[in-house]
């Protein structure tokens, strides 16, 4: 099997469903109006690529690494981002999100310090064991999005809605919240307020 290498290329309207993609490397590439669903990425690498108006759903990874990806106006569903961290662990998969919808995603053991999720929709998603200190979630729809064993010190949740933060396992010191959503922090304490 020969490797496939692409640098500074543009891919438009690429449609992939139920495919196994092996040994591809994409550096500084742009994907526009592409759909990738139920695919397995085997030993691929995506570095500093941009995705615009793309739909990526239920993608599985087998030794694939991604770093510094940018997403704009994308729908991202069923992705376990923690499994896509590069082997050196020095960079995170996502560099920037703009006007994206994320649903059923998993972020585990990731350093997302100072990351801006601002004004993106992130629903039914789990953040576990992540460093989210000083991150921005302001204006986000976070319906049924859970935070467990995360550092969210100084994170900004103002005007965010629907989040579930386990205050027992998360460090929330100096995080910013808005009323009435801040009352959601009490959910993990299993108490009643009358």
Regions found by a protein language model. Give the residues of each.
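Tandem repeat scaffolds
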Residues: 1-194
């Amino acid at each position: 099997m020969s490797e496939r290498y692409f640098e500074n290329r543009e891919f438009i309207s690429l449609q992939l469903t139920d495919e196994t993609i092996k040994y591809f490397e994409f550096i500084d590439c742009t994907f526009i109006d592409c759909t990738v669903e139920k695919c397995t990425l085997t030993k691929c690498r995506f570095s500093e690529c941009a995705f615009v108006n793309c739909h990526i759903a239920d993608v599985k990874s087998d030794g694939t690494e991604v770093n510094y990806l940018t997403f704009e106006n994308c729908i991202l569903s069923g992705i376990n981002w923690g499994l896509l961290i590069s082997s050196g662990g020095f960079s995170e998969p996502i560099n920037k999100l703009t006007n994206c919808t994320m649903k059923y995603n998993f972020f585990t053991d990731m350093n997302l310090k100072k990351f801006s999720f601002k004004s993106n929709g992130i629903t039914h998603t789990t953040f576990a064991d992540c460093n989210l200190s000083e991150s921005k979630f302001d204006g986000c729809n976070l319906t049924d999005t859970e935070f467990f064993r995360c550092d969210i010190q100084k994170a900004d949740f103002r005007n965010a809605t629907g989040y579930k933060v386990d205050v027992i396992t998360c460090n929330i010191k100096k995080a910013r919240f808005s009323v009435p959503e801040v009352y959601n922090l009490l959910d993990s304490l299993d108490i009643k307020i009358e």
